[in-house]
Amino acid sequence: MDILARTAHLVGWPRHFGPASGSDPKIRDAMARYVLTVFANGTLLGPAQVARHMRDQVSAHELSIAANKHTTCAKIDAASTDVINEFAKLDVAGMWGDGRVVAVDGTQVDTWANNILAESHIRYGGYGGIAYRHISDTYIALFSRFIPCGVWEAVYIIEGLLRNDSDIQPDTIHADTQGQSLPVFGLAALLGFDLLPRIRNWADLNFYRPSADAGFEHIDSLFGDNVIDWGLIDTHWPDLLRTTISISQGRLSSVTLLRRLGNNSRKNRLYRAFRELGRVIRTITLLRFLADAQLREQITAITNKAEAFHGFSAWLRFGGEVIGRNDPDYQEKIIKFNELLANCVIYSNACDITAAANALASDGHPIDTDDLATISPYITHTIRRFGDWVLDLSPPDAVPVTTLDLVPGALFPGDITS
C-alpha cells in the first residue's frame, strides 16, 4: 500500500481515474480512494476485506463505487502506461534490456465455473481463463488481457503491441509454441515485428524451398518437396497491404482478423495468402533459430522473464486464487489492476536498487554493472502483505534519482544519500 501511495505521488497515475463524464470526482480524498481501489482489486482481496482491515477509514461500498464507476480497462491501461514511462527513464532499466524485445505468454487464472469465459485448461489443469501478458526485456509489463483457455494464444499476440502506448516500443517478439502460427508470422512481418518464438516441435515443421530446383549444401535434408507459391503472394499482395494498413490504423482488430485466418478454407483467399507469406517468414525464422546460438539463449532468457512475472504477479494477488465474479469485464479489470499493481512495485523496487547502488558507489564500493544487471526488480522480501494496513499519503521526502552514479562523484558531487 505504501508503494502504491509512493508511486501515486511520483508518477501521478490516479489522474486517469474518475467518472465517465470526465468531471472532477465528487468523492472525499480521491487519491486515497483510488490507491485503495487498486490495492483491493490488484491483490484480489476485494473491497470488503480491505475496508475491514482499514478499521472503518473507508467502506466497502466506497471502494466498490470507485472500482465500478471511476475505472475502466482503458483507464487502467493509461495509468499503467504512466508507470511504464517513468520506469523507462531509470538507468537501471536500460541495464536489463533496451526495450526492443518483448516476451508474450499466458498463465491460467481460476474463475467460477458458470460464466461465458471459463473453460477447463488441459496444460494448466485448472478451470478459468488465461492472463495473457506482454513483458518487456526490462521486466515491466506492457499489456495484459484475459482470454479464454480454448483459443490459440497467437491470435492475441499482435493486439498487445498495437495497443501499447508507452515509450517502450518493442519490435522483436518472443513467445512459446502457442504464440505462433503461419498467418501470425505473415501479419507480424507486414506490421514490422520480428516474431521469434520458442518452437517446441520445430523438427516436425516444414522448411519451404524458394523454388523447386533450389538446393542447399549441408542442410538440404531439412527441406522436403514443399515450394513457396510466390504467385499466390503476388496476386494477393495488395489485399495483404490493405489489411495490414487497416489494422495498424485501428480500423480492423488484429484479433478479429487472426480468428478469421484460423479457418483453413479453400474459399478463404486471404487466409491462403497470409499462410503462404507465413511459410516464407517461418522458414527464415527456423533457419535463424538453428544457426544462432545467441538468439536461442535470448529467447530462453526473455521467456523466463515472462514466467517470472507470472509468479511475481501471483504473489501480489494474495487475496485469493479465484476471480469470484462471472462478469467478463470485471475479470479483465482484475488482470489489469494486478498488472498496474505489479508495475508500481517494479518501478519502486527499481528506484530502490538505483539508490542502493549509488550509495554503495559513494562509499567506495566497486559496482560491477554486469552483476547489477542480474538483480531482478521482482523483489518480494521487503514487502509486508498481511496485518493492519495504514494508508500514508504523505509525499515522498525526495524525488528518486533516475541516474546511476557508479563512479563516485562523477555525476553527483557530494553525498548522494543526503
Where are these regions (language model features)?
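Short, conserved catalytic/metal-binding motifs centered on acidic residues
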Residues: 50, 102-107, 173-178
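Flexible, glycine/threonine-enriched loop-and-boundary segments that flank and lead into catalytic domains
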Residues: 108-119
